[in-house]
Amino acid sequence: MKKYIFLFFAVCAFSVYANAQNRTGDCTSYTSDDRSVTFYLNDSSAIQLRLCSQSTVRIWFSPDGSFQRSNPSFAVVNEDLEDVGTVHVDEQNACYEIFTPKLRIRVNKSPFNLQIFDKYQKLLFSDYADKGHISNGQRKLEYKTLRRDEHFFGLGEKTGKLDRRGEAYKMWNSDKPCYSAVEDPLYKSIPFFMSSYRYGIFLDNTYKTEFKFGTESRDYYSFEAPGGEMIYYFIFGKDYKEIMKQYVDLTGKPIMPPKWALGFAQCRGLLTSEKLSYEIAEGYRKRGIPCDVIYQDIGWTQYLQDFEWRKGNYENPKKMLADLKDMGFKVVVSQDPVISQANKRQWEEADRLGYLVKDSTNGRSYDMPWPWGGNCGVVDFTLPAVADWWGAYQQKPIDDGIAGFWTDMGEPAWSNEEQTERLVMKHHLGMHDEIHNVYGLTWDKVVKEQFEKRNPNRRVFQMTRAAFAGLQRYTFGWTGDCGNGDDVTQGWGQMANQIPVLLSAGLGIIPFTTCDITGYCGDIEDYPAMAELYTRWIQMGAFNPLSRIHHEGNVAVEPWLFGEEAEKNAKAAIELKYRLLPYIYTYAREAHETGLPL
């Protein structure tokens, strides 16, 4: 008999537990304080609504009701967007209501169910049935009602169609060279999307979040986080532009590029020598093809990342930079966020100072395999003391005459979601599962702020591969190592894939961006066969806000290599961009002020 009684109570307990995982609790009370209202549920959870403005609401689901987070937001710089006065809650039998001049917010009590209407009482956004807010250990999930005619856009650089409905996406900065037209995740994580029902959602969580737009049911969409806090912002606007502008108010304005950055640029994977830099510069000027920027890729340094010119490749780098400047070229060099162990002096210095990310299993500096230069230490940019130390090193080539940086491999490189061994990395501000997606952002912040600190009255040029929401405050973007395929047919498809990726980047508030024109990897050396495709790459690239020709290795992709017809057409496309430059620069200023894409 005792056995059956035990089984009865065990089944009841499991039922209660299972119900707690699959149903949002009932609201039993609330408290209010200035802008915020906190609703308490009978399962010990709580949900806080904070009015950031008349049309923006921060929603915080706390399963234990503590409302504690390990770090301040990496993305949000200002959430009190306007004076909203003291929030007034109207309590009714079945619900609570909060009104602003633009929104009606309704909280149904049993179960807790959040609904947001516009001022004309049109339902914009709603929790789904009785499971709007669910927790399962550290995992937190939000389920929202999906309308038959609702469509979604955003999430930053993502492949595939612009409409996200019917698709699922992950946020985990990943190194995906030659990525396909359906690859996900990629290099940047921008957990911000917009609905055709005139609202946007920004999920302010840095872990590997997931978004499912009707893939599990045609009745709901969902977003979830495996760790951290479930904090997201509901942003209402009359159109997408207004929604994006308010997101920019939350996360900061884009930096304004120098005018030359909007011209054309030339690079290749092994453009890492004085001799080749002169040859390319002279090739452009001899043929009268406009070009403003020459890049130097990863091999320009003696070691990663000592910022010293590679001996043998550069005889007199200061003179080279001065000569190229006289020819009308700016030079941008790459930097990586690591210190090669072969770079003994700098690595030992960083290790001694505690400036490298630690291995939590042994307390030592983490031993990171790297695509170039052997194993490395990973610089911990979340540690405040690192900023000036790194800034002093990166100032060396600036003093020599370079114009800016491209911050490469900040995922960190070779990262993807299957490589869980890297999760043992411990940063100053937390374990790697929390910091991974913002690692590149913390690096870009240091690069930008140190550049401005040491070079006042100069506009920073920085272009990054890996970042998180808010990157626009520090850097420009490019879409990473896109491909050109293994043959001409694949190349056309890969080029076409870059169009929605670039458009989606703009919707994710990366207004200043480019792809690797010609595709970073893939076969393009059969120049006659590739001539037409190359021409189309250049023509498409001319309408990138930033325009950079780039390919892997020592594969030359200058316009004059693809035949007379291709050179003529490429030159015409590039000249068209320069004729449009007054308009481009005007819209660049607007993008700087508003965040809207060019």
Please report, for each region that a protein language model flagged, where it lies by residue.
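C-terminal substrate/ligand-recognition segments
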Residues: C267-G269, S277-Y278, G283-K286, I549, ...
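N-terminal accessory segment at the very beginning of proteins
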Residues: N19-W260, C267-G269, S273-E282, V293, ...
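Generic alpha-helical structural element
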Residues: A181, Y232-F236, Q266-S273, V379, ...
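Bacterial Sec-dependent N-terminal signal peptides
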Residues: M1-T24
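Detector for glycine-centered tight turns/loop "hinges" at secondary-structure junctions
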Residues: S44, Y120-K122, G166, T361-S365, ...
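Aromatic- and carboxylate-enriched substrate-binding clefts and catalytic-loop regions
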Residues: S73-A75, P290-A570
